[in-house]
Amino acid sequence: MSSRALRKLQRQRQTELLEEALDSESDEDDEFSSTSGKKVVNVFEILEKENNAINSEAEKSVSEEEQDEPLVEGESPIVSTNKKAKNKKKKKKQQKKKKVTGKRDLDNQSSDNEKLEGLESSKNIDDDIDEIEKAAAELKLKYREQDQVEHVAGVEESATIPLDKELDEKLNKLLGVNISMLNPDLEIRKIFGRIVEKRSVNARHDNLRRKRHVLVQPQEGWPPLVRSGLGMKLTGQSQDLECFFEITQSRAYQEVQETFEYYVQTYDPNNLLMLLRSHPFHIDTLLQVSEIIDQQGDHELSAELVARGLYAFDSILHPRFNLATGATRLPFAIPSNRRLFLCIWRYLQSLQSRGCWRTVFEFCKALLQFDMSDPYAIGTCIDIYALRRREFAWIIDFANYLENSNKISDTPNMLYSSALAMFYVHGDTTDTRASMLAAFERAPYMLSELLDTLNISFTKSSIPSPQDPVQELHSAMYALYAKDSWSDPTVLAFINSILEKETVTLHDVEGQFAELTENLSRRVILLNEQSLRKFLPQRILQGTILSFDPLPPDTYLSESQVFGRDISRRIASFLSDYLSRAREVNENEEEPPAHEFDLPPAEQLLQQIESEVGEESEDGTPVMTRLRSFFGSLFTSTNSETEPAEESTEEMGQGD
């Protein structure tokens, strides 16, 4: 019998017992009323007597047929079915008004039959339960063997999972941003309490009714943001759930951008201020004016302008843009994306002056996950912010990730910071000493300047010096920005103990770079620290550094940069020389050679450019094909505009 049938049988049995209890109560009530009260003649009593007589005769005949059969325990003398049980209940209900003696006899007989039926049903239930338990045991044995097979298969499958995928998942977890901690007001309130809040209760309630923002909270007095001209689109998604985004610009925004670039070349701040009044959420204008105001000493207004630019980005975030996943990507090679990088970095600088180290730390994680190539070299400073915020466990986990992915050599600062974090967590232990010694031995070029900053002397042996500009920069930056975390007296005593008691073996680390890498150079420009600018290559120092786009990468994905950086420079240089020579010719009133008049002016210029520049750029871009089309349309439109003017002049002369 199935478990469903057993449950159904149990429900029926419970229903029968409940109805019998109700019937017995009603019978007792009837008996009490019949004995205590005066007997009342019922008109239906005659019919009931006749029915009782017929039923008694039927029961008597059935009992006579079964007299010869012996009674066995557990068997019922009457074949009981659900239908018969229901009929008996109906009969009982019809016989409520019968005589007391007859009702007692029928009730006794019915109770005996029900007891026998209960014994039989309980025996059947026990048999069915035994069968179910036996079947369950067989199934358990079967599925246990199947689970063992699946477990072995799962172990084999997990062993085949690529290590790179596991590392990527670990990195995404490490770079996941706590969205609530991107609000510096929450951090300040947590440190100093609500007493620092100057807003009224009504103002706080008004802010609660506003839209929840991710990057920055809008401030009172800002102009309303209707349409900034910016947008964000999802450009792709990888199998590892990485979402790639691109910030888009409308045609009107691009026209404002062209105006901004023209005003920058005029070196007149008033033009930028005028542009900012008419377009209060143009990103490059906000950043440029913010830098000018910061140089004048108004740091609060400068930070407010940067926050306004970040608010413009916050208003266009894509629904799939989720910094908490650690897998949000904004390729740095796209020029429009670089504005968000720069805006966040400028915002971080203002937060550092307020001591909001947790907010700075969370924004650094966002910059790291935007582009895994780390264009701002955040890996060289995020550990310093984590130390200030006492995120020791995160530093140790991130250093382990870099070690497992063979990237620790690019960020030697993580060797020192992870060892320091272990000391803060575990104290002076064997593992902590081993970690600190490993940092000294693997990156000894950083030790000398750090010890000098901490006023610690080491005379056992000479400390190796940096062997290339990259090692020099790492040593200088870490000693400059991490000294506060190493200045604790317990840390100084720990370092002195290691240098005096432990055997420290230091060797030179071979240099690999003749000059700073592009990312490190960009970081030096962003830091704007005069003591570090000496490490920049001369080609960068002698070139033009744009504050609104510092050191853009060599590869552009924008339509306005189709020729490439090298070709654009060479074309611009040639055109400048060409125009200078033409100006000198006009001043000297010398006529060009006769053969130059055989070709149209555009063709002359194109031939000279082709001889100077070449047909293709370094990456194989067909420059001259596009340039010929451009010059052809340019000169055609120019001729079409000048011809009607000449005709009108002739008509005017004829009219005169």
Swiss-Prot record:
Q: Where is the composition biased (Basic and acidic residues)?
A: 51-63, 102-122
Task: Enumerate the Gene Ontology biological process terms.
Answer: rescue of stalled ribosome; ribosome-associated ubiquitin-dependent protein catabolic process
Official protein name in the record: Ribosome quality control complex subunit 1
Give the organism's phylogenetic lineage.
Eukaryota, Fungi, Dikarya, Ascomycota, Taphrinomycotina
Acidic residues compositional bias, start-end: 17-32
Q: Note whether Signal occurs among the keywords.
A: no
Q: Which InterPro entries match?
A: TCF25/Rqc1
Q: Where is this region: Disordered?
A: 1-35, 51-122, 634-656
Enumerate the UniProt keywords alphabetically. Answer: Cytoplasm, Phosphoprotein
Q: Name one GO cellular component term.
A: RQC complex
A single Pfam family it belongs to is Tcf25
Per UniProt, subunit arrangement is:
Component of the ribosome quality control complex (RQC), composed of the E3 ubiquitin ligase rkr1/ltn1, rqc1 and mtr1/rqc2, as well as cdc48 and its ubiquitin-binding cofactors. RQC forms a stable complex with 60S ribosomal subunits.
Where found, per UniProt?
Cytoplasm
Give all Phosphoserine modified positions.
56, 61, 63, 110-111
Q: Is the Acetylation keyword given for this protein? A: no
* The species this protein was found in: Schizosaccharomyces pombe (strain 972 / ATCC 24843)
What does this gene product do? Component of the ribosome quality control complex (RQC), a ribosome-associated complex that mediates ubiquitination and extraction of incompletely synthesized nascent chains for proteasomal degradation. Within the RQC complex, rqc1 is essential for the recruitment of cdc48 to incompletely synthesized nascent polypeptides that are ubiquitinated by rkr1/ltn1.
> Where along the chain is composition biased (Basic residues)?
1-11, 83-101
- Family indicated by similarity: Belongs to the TCF25 family.
